[in-house]
Amino acid sequence: GFDRIVFEFAGEEVPGYHVEYIDKPVRACGSGDVVPLAGDGWLQVRFEPARAHTDEGKPTLGSRELAPRLPNLLVLKSTCDFEGQVEWVAGVGSPNGYRVLELEKPSRFVVDIKHK
């Protein structure tokens, strides 16, 4: 099985993206502050150009941290919304394989992380 993360975007297209496992310490963009994350693997999802705030600077997302309690996905944290770049890092119990999908109507980007 898979644990699924879905990012939804305004507009007709998913922005450019890059997905990879990264080493600790996980750092916030801009400040460089260390971001504590649970898990034995950290899958970074970066979108560019993108933003997660309005023109007035208000966040467009409900939460910057989620703890979904899924078999492998332990936590999902926003680590960047700065200068046209948005990043999220998933803390996983085991850094297993993953796949990505782009979906339409509405525009969505999906990351499926294998359980084993």
PLM segments and residue spans:
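Short linear recognition/processing motifs and adjacent strand/loop elements at protein termini
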Residues: 1-116
